[in-house]
Amino acid sequence: MEAVQQNHSVCRGYCGVMLRSRSGGFFRRGFMLGNVEVILARPRGFCAGVERAVRTLESVASRYAGTREVYALHEIVHNLHVVNSFKKMGVKFVSALHEVPEGAVLVFSAHGVSQQIKEESRRKGLTVVDATCPLVTKVHLEIQRYDKSGYQVILVGHKGHREVEGSMGQVSNPVVLVQNVQDVQSIKTPSAAKLAYVTQTTLSMDDTAEIINALKLRFPQIVGPDLRDICYATQNRQTAVKAMSQMVDVVLAIGSKNSSNSNRLLDLAKAQNARAYLIDSYRNIDLEWLIGARRIGITAGASAPEILVQEVIDYLGLHANLKVRTMDGVSENITFKLPELD
């Protein structure tokens, strides 16, 4: 949005600052959207795994401030606000291990890494702090257990996602990646082979259930955890956004574009026929999205801090007479112990 001073002759004596939308329309600063009820999803925002990863990197950055360089392999969590905050603290984010000098401090992200990355880190003499979400670690252990027992492991997930890359690198044998029901029909393996599946933790429950059903139909002998690999926080946020989307005219899902779980929230809101938009922050909001909306729903992906939710509410309050309430939903009280620092 850019601020533009309106011509007094046009506005017949009143004026003030007008705001230009992305499509070129103008809106007066104030209550131009009228009375609007904002409904906040419960739960929303940080999950226990993200909270653990963020607090871990905070602790590491504080401990080694001014004495050793701190690196993080990939984004600690998939959220631009969080990553930029750590950059201001001096944390260096890298995309490959060769960018980390020998003897430095390295933090693994919440998404986990392959066994090869762990071994290379040891060879370089790095001080490693592993902030992998414990629920992702659980999937890693399942893959290792199935592989050791002679199963061909099938991973349901999104190609290129950091969590998927780390999970596929837990064993030396190939792991088959399945992204959709069509991929199930393309699996080349003997029909009587020992098969086991695991899933990425941040998938859509509905889509994953469909894929698992397709796997069981084609391979009746396949074993796996059903939907138990999809983390509790992902399930809770998806259930909440489904319910909330049926109450509102517009849904604002706060999260970065590379956040898998945030994108699933967006998809689910749209599936309920709500107008839905994924935003990194209030700066991405186009007021034209909200014209005619009497109820606006706000949710946030598991990597998005609550401050971003509050900033969106504050921004909407500049342009509407707001009433804010939180929907009924699950209260989360789970915490994960931080990794020990040497």
From Swiss-Prot:
Signal peptide: none annotated. Its cofactor is [4Fe-4S] cluster. It comes from the Bacteria. It is an enzyme of class 1 (oxidoreductase). GO terms for molecular function: 4 iron, 4 sulfur cluster binding; 4-hydroxy-3-methylbut-2-enyl diphosphate reductase activity; metal ion binding. [4Fe-4S] cluster binds at residues 47, 133, 231. (2E)-4-hydroxy-3-methylbut-2-enyl diphosphate binds at residues 78, 111, 161, 201, 259-261, 303. Binds 1 [4Fe-4S] cluster per subunit. Keywords: 4Fe-4S, Iron, Iron-sulfur, Isoprene biosynthesis, Metal-binding, Oxidoreductase. Its EC number is 1.17.7.4. Belongs to the IspH family. This is 4-hydroxy-3-methylbut-2-enyl diphosphate reductase. It comes from Anaplasma marginale (strain Florida).
